[in-house]
């Protein structure tokens, strides 16, 4: 231990004598280690971190495999549950000691005269019990709160409690108002619990039974027009002792046919019922929570970690070269110490201690840099309409990763120069006057290897950068099919206000008239979804014979003047106008891709018509094509 302390003190003195070299070395390592630690922190938050709950390894996600068939309100290989189907599964399952469901939404919140949007977690009665989460203050929602009539209250997340109530215990028992309905505050969740969805966090947890109170009438997922077609609940459970995922999936498979028969949507036709009854239940681990971000972000994050690792290797090769050059100027000092009886092992240890000090300093600075970079990356991908939250504490995993990088970098850039300097022949060096000529061939060969390594790694990075630049250039220069500049987007959500359709139309017309009257505004229009906003809606286009789906088509509901506003080129036909009312024949404007896909590439699509899916008992939905426009991007820029 004394020898180690002496080596470290000696290393500090030598580094202090060369402040310029030390600063450059520490900065180089800080950038390399910081970039790697930042990416690792993101990977840890998205893929590796387990939920802060009791025994997360025994939790399992229950999801529906829809066999890649979709219609109406569900689509894709994995689907959430409707409320009636969730009730059936909850009552019939025997694989879990406890099972729970949850949904998420953004609702209007009023507290103390302030009104804004809150992230609301709709939790079934056993949600917190299944997770094993205990309250930080007060009590959490229980099965007694999630009953018909829903007389229970709400729980606040710790962060929301701190923001809105300053962390005061007097918040318990107070009332908050969601969508105009008062609810008492029951408790506060622990500081480490942000929910079960990676990338999101909730503000308020409320029983599932309160959903019809919040979203009244036809808008409710439980008591609205189509509760059996509203897929909004995610389900998870805690496996019984001795049960595994395979056994749980097998047991759920035995109850699914009966559960599906009890919940067939009455609007489905024979084809829809056939596919609905073919659904199966699957299970997968829930220790890391629910996440759509995990599948989307994992590959890019691993790629970024690999590229940042190359940057660190280049930095280590560069520092090794600097240390070799620095060691050549100290050959006489080292030769004298060897001649006086100093052991080579002690000298190598002292030289390695300098490298270790540089690596530790670089790791410490890199840790601070990593915290800034990781949070900056999250802020970069987050938008006001789709905020992203990741729990990224600087815990033992991140510190261990940074410490491991410090050890690795010490070996990579410090070991070879230390071994080379510790093995110089003192007699030959002293005879030449210590001018650094001894062992020059070996030193230069090592330096050439390091330089070649730097060049090779730099070429790999350069090639990767060029590919990224080309992809970015393609995205930047791609014609989106509409004007990107000079367009202002504002959102109005009538569903939250429970405004009748007639009043919505009147309000919208008056609003557009006022906007068009503003000096500098050329035109204005409305649409359900603005271009490239990350959301989309589709409907099934059917053939005219058997009514079988030809495929899904993206759709949007727009006002007259929309294509003029976004400057999407009209190829033929006309725009919508005031005569295209709800009582008039249904009309549509299609794009080039629609014509190719569903109309066999017709040269003139004007006057043609197509049919979309309609529930049994309703009139067939036929649309006459009155216009055709140029293709444009809608969901994203890909």
Where do the language-model regions lie?
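N-terminal membrane-entry
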Residues: 293-309, 397-401
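Nucleotide-cofactor and metal-assisted catalytic machinery
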Residues: 22-24, 34-290, 375-400, 467-638
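Glycine-rich segments within core transmembrane alpha-helices of 12-TM secondary carriers
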Residues: 362-366, 370, 410
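Alpha-helical transmembrane segments of integral membrane proteins
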Residues: 1-22, 289-293, 322-349, 353, ...
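Active-site alpha-helix of zinc metalloproteases
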Residues: 154, 314, 350, 358, ...
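Transmembrane alpha-helix boundary/hinge residues in polytopic small-molecule transporters
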Residues: 42, 319, 368, 372, ...
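Histidine-centered acyl-transfer/condensation active-site motif
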Residues: 310-320
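Short, strongly hydrophobic transmembrane alpha-helices
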Residues: 18-46, 50, 316, 359-363, ...
């Amino acid at each position: 231990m004394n020898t180690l302390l002496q080596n470290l003190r000696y290393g500090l003195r030598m580094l202090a004598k060369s402040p310029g070299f030390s600063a450059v070395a520490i900065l180089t390592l800080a950038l390399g280690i910081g970039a790697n630690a930042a990416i690792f922190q993101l990977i840890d938050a998205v893929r590796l971190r387990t939920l802060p709950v009791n025994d997360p390894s025994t939790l399992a996600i229950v999801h529906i495999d829809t066999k890649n068939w979709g219609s109406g309100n569900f689509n894709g290989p994995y689907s959430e549950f409707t409320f009636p189907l969730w009730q059936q599964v909850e009552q019939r399952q025997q694989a879990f000691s406890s099972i729970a469901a949850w949904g998420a939404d953004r609702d209007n919140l009023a507290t103390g005269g302030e009104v804004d949007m809150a992230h609301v977690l709709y939790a079934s009665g056993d949600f917190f019990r299944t997770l094993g989460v205990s309250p930080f203050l007060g009590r959490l929602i229980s099965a007694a709160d999630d009953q018909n009539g829903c007389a229970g209250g709400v729980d606040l997340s710790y962060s929301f409690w701190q923001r809105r109530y300053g962390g005061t215990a007097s918040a318990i028992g107070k009332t908050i108002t969601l969508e105009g309905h008062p609810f008492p505050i029951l408790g506060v969740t622990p500081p480490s619990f942000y929910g079960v969805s990676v990338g999101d966090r909730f503000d308020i947890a409320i029983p599932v039974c309160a959903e019809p109170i919040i979203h009244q009438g036809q808008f409710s997922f439980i008591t609205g027009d189509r509760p059996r077609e509203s897929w909004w609940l995610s389900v998870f459970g805690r496996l019984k002792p001795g049960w595994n995922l395979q056994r749980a999936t097998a047991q759920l498979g035995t109850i699914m046919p009966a559960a599906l028969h009890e919940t067939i949507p009455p609007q489905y036709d024979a084809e829809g019922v056939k596919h609905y009854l073919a659904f199966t239940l699957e299970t997968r681990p829930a220790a890391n929570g629910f996440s759509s971000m995990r599948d989307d972000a994992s590959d890019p994050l691993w790629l970024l970690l690999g590229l940042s690792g190359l940057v660190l290797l280049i930095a280590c090769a560069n520092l090794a070269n600097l240390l070799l050059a620095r060691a050549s100027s100290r050959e006489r000092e080292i030769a004298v110490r060897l001649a006086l009886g100093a052991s080579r092992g002690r000298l190598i240890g002292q030289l390695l201690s300098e490298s270790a000090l540089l690596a530790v300093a670089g790791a410490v600075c890199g840790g601070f840099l990593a915290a800034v970079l990781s949070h900056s990356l999250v802020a970069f991908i987050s938008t006001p309409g789709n905020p992203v939250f990741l729990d990224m504490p600087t815990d033992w995993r991140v510190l261990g990763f940074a410490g491991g990088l410090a050890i690795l970098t010490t070996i990579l850039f410090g070991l070879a120069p230390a071994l080379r300097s510790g093995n110089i022949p003192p007699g030959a060096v002293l005879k030449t006057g210590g001018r650094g000529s001894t062992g020059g061939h070996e030193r230069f060969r090592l330096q050439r290897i390091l330089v070649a390594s730097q060049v090779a790694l730099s070429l790999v990075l350069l090639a990767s950068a060029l590919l990224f630049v080309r992809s970015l250039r393609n995205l930047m220069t791609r014609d989106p099919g509409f004007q990107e500049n000079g367009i202002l987007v504002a959102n109005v959500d009538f569903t939250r206000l429970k405004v009748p359709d007639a009043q919505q139309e009147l309000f919208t017309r008056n609003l557009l008239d006022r906007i068009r009257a503003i000096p500098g505004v050329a035109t204005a229009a409305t649409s359900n979804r603005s271009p490239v906003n990350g959301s989309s809606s589709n409907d099934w286009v059917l053939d005219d014979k058997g009514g079988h789906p030809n495929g899904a088509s993206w759709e949007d509901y727009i006002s007259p003047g929309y294509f003029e506003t976004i400057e999407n080129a009209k190829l033929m036909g006309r725009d919508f106008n005031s005569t295209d009312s709800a009582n008039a024949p249904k009309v549509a404007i299609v794009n080039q891709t629609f014509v190719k896909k569903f109309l066999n590439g017709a040269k003139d699509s004007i006057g043609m018509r197509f049919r979309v899916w309609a529930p049994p008992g309703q009139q067939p939905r036929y649309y006459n094509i009155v216009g055709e426009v140029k293709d444009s991007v809608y969901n994203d820029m890909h």
